Amino acid sequence: MAENHCELLPPAPSGLGAGLGGGLCRRCSAGIGALAQRPSGVSKWVRLNVGGTYFLTTRQTLCRDPKSFLYRLCQADPDLDSDKDETGAYLIDRDPTYFGPVLNYLRHGKLVINRDLAEEGVLEEAEFYNITSLIKLVKDKIRERDSKTSQMPVKHVYRVLQCQEEELTQMVSTMSDGWKFEQLVSIGSSYNYGNEDQAEFLCVVSKELHNTPYGTTSEPSEKAKILQERGSRM
């Protein structure tokens, strides 16, 4: 088994290194030199106040991208207008919900976005903090998502609604929520005692069913709910 030996340096001149007990090995000398180069009073940890939410991370994490806003913040760039709160945390007026994916990307280099967050929101933050590699990654993810969505077959929802002639105008006004007429079928007249006959129709309407990236459909609007209620009463 190989043995490690320290190679001693020549004793320091009088007055230099007197408190270190004479000559030092090269390895120990290099370690002491590295410690001497670290600025005194500078902590390894950095506290951020992003939109009222606190984040604690290391300078090494924030300095991953030398061109980013966070790198300049850690370097105390005089051209960067930054303030601190009463706890000493850097104040950043941004959405803390979307800062989480940005910070985690700097920590481990992977983009992880929760299902309740939009890729466009993460892209907005990546551009604000000027993290070029993250910007490219999110844009690629958005293109991939849009490509999958465009390749999905279009589905339609159909409703058959019964209405009288005088209700047709109101029916038309409810079509602006993506619903459109497919067919109008006359089914004769309804007999109202003492009143004129009212022509009745069956209205066939349809709407495209859009899927979200996670396979769920969007919630129907108020107009869509009205149409669905009319169809269910038939």
UniProtKB/Swiss-Prot annotation:
Q: Which InterPro entries match?
A: BTB/POZ_dom, SKP1/BTB/POZ_sf, T1-type_BTB
Q: Which CDD domains match?
A: BTB_POZ_KCTD5 (cd18390)
The record's section on Gene3D superfamilies has: 3.30.70.2000, 6.10.140.750, Potassium Channel Kv1.1, Chain A
What is the native source organism of this protein? Answer: Rattus norvegicus (Rat)
List the GO cellular component terms. Cul3-RING ubiquitin ligase complex; cytoplasm; cytosol; nucleus
What is the documented function of this protein? Its interaction with CUL3 suggests that it may act as a substrate adapter in some E3 ligase complex. Does not affect the function of Kv channel Kv2.1/KCNB1, Kv1.2/KCNA2, Kv4.2/KCND2 and Kv3.4/KCNC4.
Q: Output the lineage of the source organism.
A: Eukaryota, Metazoa, Chordata, Craniata, Vertebrata
In its UniProt record, a GO molecular function of this protein is:
identical protein binding
Which keywords are on file for this protein? Acetylation, Cytoplasm, Nucleus
Q: What is this protein called?
A: BTB/POZ domain-containing protein KCTD5
According to the record, the residues making up region (Disordered) are 213-234
According to the entry, every stretch annotated as the BTB domain falls at 44-146
Q: What is known of its domains?
A: The BTB (POZ) domain is atypical and mediates the formation of a homopentamer instead of a homotetramer. Homopentamerization is due to the presence of 4 residues in the BTB (POZ) domain: Leu-56, Gly-100, Val-112 and Ala-118.
